[in-house]
Structure formats: structure tokens, C-alpha cells
Amino acid sequence: MSIKSGFVALAGKPNVGKSTFINVVMGRKVVIVSDKPQTTRNRINCIYTDRDSQIIFVDTPGIHKPLHRLGEYMVKAAVQALKGVDLILFMLDAADGFTKTDEHVAKIVSESGTKTIIAVNKIDVAGEEKAKAVGQLAKSMVENVVSVHYISALKGEGVFEVLEKIKEELPEGPQYYPEDMVTDRPLSFMAAEIIREKIFHLTRQEVPHSTAVVIEEIKDRPNGVLYIRANIYVERDSQKGILIGKNGSMIKKIGTLAREELEFLVGRKVYLDLNVKVKENWREKDFIILQEIGLKDDIK
């Protein structure tokens, strides 16, 4: 039996709701979500399968003006993800209006020559009139637009209409992945992302953006517990102090929340060993950490 299948890249500036959209479609959390911009750093393939389709959503970092080498890698990974896909889902934030960054993303999307669906998110916040103005501006700047939709990813409104349109536009093809597979990323990547999400939720200002999580070891213990050891890198001693907290209170909270989610993910007990280390200016200079968190691999 033939199915509709293919790759769909999500494009947009930071914090427009790309990861929330994917999690709603998947019916579970596959990618981390935060109200802070630039939460997603890597290109992540999320695999949606039903009885007549398989859609590989390529969730990308938001396209923005980079301030350091980490930012450069993130933007290059996002732009590269638009090449060779079957369809682009270009997402915008209705509440923000149509910004200069949106204009920049629209140009990149248009130059790709790929069929594009536009989804204007946060219509529940901005209202229909403002959302439609954003959608029409975006449509006027992008070649090959097949449809424009107005959605609230957070509330799930309009999301499945977009999903049906994606299925309609995809070609008939093979099932690329087993039907029970939801991402092509390994456990080490998922563990690092879960830890990083808790840091984003619990810390403020520059601390979460200055943080890298590197999984050093994952092993099964004889008692059935999964042991995970992770290093959390920051750029300054003051950031290390914030992450550890008074009498270790913050790192304990991060560890507890991450461990609980990891146990749900793997279906058994987890021992999570977190260590905070300082690597000055790692986002600009430390190629080893950039390699470890996967960004250099994403743009080869």
C-alpha cells in the first residue's frame, strides 16, 4: 500500500512556536520548549506516522542575526535544513507583526524554490485582523506558497488543518522509519536536551543561553538503574554559582525535574550525575564543546 511521505522543514525566527507545533502534532513532547528565544540549537528530525502517511518534520533553530560562533552554527544549520526537503512550513508570530527578521527568513525560504505552507501562529493573542495582515505580507514575499493558515499551536487550534494540507502536498513514497520511532536522535541527545530545558525554565537572563550540556557517560548498572553523567558548561564563575544555587538547591532542582522526565522517557529508574564546569567564552572559541553538542556535525 502506498503512503504519503516526505520531509518538511520548519522555518521561522526564534520563538514563533515551531517546537510547540511539532509536539502538538506528535501528541507528546519530542522537542524542548521554552518561552525564551533560541531554545532549539540543533536540527532535529521528528517522525509522525499514521496509517496513510509518514512525515519527517525537520525542526530547526530560529533564523536570527548571530552574535557569536554558536549562533553562526545555529543559523547555518537552519538554512541548510531547507535544502532537499519536500515542503517548507514557514511559521510567523502574529503578535509580533511582520518584522525585519521575518522578512529575512521569507527571502531565504523563497530562494530555496521549495513549495511552502505559511502558518501564522498566536492568532489567539493577536486577533484575526493582525494575523491576516502578517500572513498576506509573508505570502507576497515568498514564491511557491500553496496555502496560508492561521493557528494557535499552544491551544491546538488549526494545527491539524495544517497537518492535512501537508499530507495533501507530499508525494507518495516509502515509509522511511519504523512506525514506533518518533525521532532519529539518540538517547544521549535527548538526555542533554531535557537537562537543558530545565535550565531554561529555572534560570534567567544570560545563564540558559550560556549553557551547554554534554553527556559524558550512559551505562546500565547491575541493579537495573540507568546511570547518566553529564557536564554542564557555563562561561563565568558567576553563572556556575547561579546554576548550583545556595547549598546546591538549584542544581538539585534541575536534576530532580530532568531525572523524572528521563525516567518517564526510558521507563525505568535513572541516576543522574550533574557536574557544573566553567569554560570561558565557549560559544565563540571552544570547538570541542560545539562538536559535542552536535552543531558542527549539522553543517558539514
UniProtKB/Swiss-Prot annotation:
The gene is era. CDD domains: Era, KH-II_Era. One of its GO terms (cellular component) is cytosol. This is GTPase Era. It is a peripheral membrane protein. Residues 59-62 are annotated as: G3. Residues 121-124 are annotated as: G4. It is found in: Cytoplasm; Cell inner membrane. The keyword Aminoacyl-tRNA synthetase does not apply. PROSITE patterns: G_ERA (PS51713), KH_TYPE_2 (PS50823). Residues 12-19 are annotated as: G1. GTP binds at residues 12-19, 59-63, 121-124. Coiled coil: none annotated. Residues 195-280 form the KH type-2 domain. One of its GO terms (biological process) is ribosomal small subunit assembly. InterPro entries: G_ERA_dom, GTP-bd, GTPase_Era-like, KH_dom-like_a/b, KH_dom_type_2, KH_sf_prok-type, P-loop_NTPase, Small_GTP-bd. Monomer. Keywords: Cell inner membrane, Cell membrane, Cytoplasm, GTP-binding, Membrane, Nucleotide-binding, Ribosome biogenesis, RNA-binding, rRNA-binding. HAMAP family: GTPase_Era. An essential GTPase that binds both GDP and GTP, with rapid nucleotide exchange. Plays a role in 16S rRNA processing and 30S ribosomal subunit biogenesis and possibly also in cell cycle regulation and energy metabolism. Belongs to the TRAFAC class TrmE-Era-EngA-EngB-Septin-like GTPase superfamily. Era GTPase family. It comes from the Bacteria. Residues 4-172 form the Era-type G domain. GO terms for molecular function: GTP binding; GTPase activity; ribosomal small subunit binding; small ribosomal subunit rRNA binding. Residues 151-153 are annotated as: G5. It comes from Thermotoga petrophila (strain ATCC BAA-488 / DSM 13995 / JCM 10881 / RKU-1). Residues 38-42 are annotated as: G2.
